[in-house]
Regions:
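A short, charged, Gly/Pro-tolerant segment at domain boundaries
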Residues: 124-129
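Hydrophobic/aromatic residues within well-ordered alpha-helical segments
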Residues: 17-21, 118
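ATP-dependent NMP and nucleoside kinases share a basic, alpha-helical "lid"
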Residues: 23-74
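Small-molecule kinase domains that catalyze NTP-dependent phosphoryl transfer to phosphate-bearing small molecules
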Residues: 25, 52-53, 73, 77-123
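Active-site loops and adjacent core secondary-structure elements that bind or stabilize anionic groups
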Residues: 12
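Short, well-ordered alpha-helix to beta-strand connector turns
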Residues: 9, 35, 54, 99-100
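Single conserved hydrophobic/aromatic residue that forms the stacking wall/gate
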Residues: 1-9
């Protein structure tokens, strides 16, 4: 079936691509000598096993309908395509439980004050090596 082929292709993709992404990220981080903080953006951080590559995880949360609208606008994707991508990802509540910090990006709460608090906490709690 198409689903089985898709799953098999996905497994091959994960085995080949994720190690390369991890290696490229590690090399990139090593080149950022003058940066106090560096970040990795990944919608599938936990699914790809990248949580062990970072010192702290900041989950950016937005209501699902807002995420769908933003992704449709940004990517030119259909609602069905975006919903399928979201369905393939870990549940938001599970991500929130696992994350060290959460930023709410709902268009109402201000982002910069949230990020400033997190950066200060990272410095204070010695997440930064």
């Amino acid at each position: 079936s198409t689903r089985v082929r898709s799953s098999a292709a996905s497994d091959v993709y994960k085995r080949q691509i994720h190690p390369r992404v991890r290696k490229d990220f590690t090399v990139w981080v090593e080149r950022q000598e003058k940066c106090e903080i560096v970040g990795m953006e990944s919608a599938i951080l936990y699914e790809a096993g990248f949580q062990d590559t970072v010192d702290a995880v900041i989950m950016v949360y937005a209501p699902v309908e807002l995420r769908i609208q933003r992704a449709m606008y940004r990517d030119g994707a259909s609602e069905e395509q975006v919903r399928a991508r979201i369905a393939a990802q870990m549940d938001d509540e599970e991500k929130r439980r696992r994350a060290d910090f959460t930023v709410v990006n709902d268009g109402v709460q201000l982002l910069i004050p949230q990020l400033n608090r997190i950066v200060e906490q990272l410095k204070t709690e010695k997440f930064i090596l």
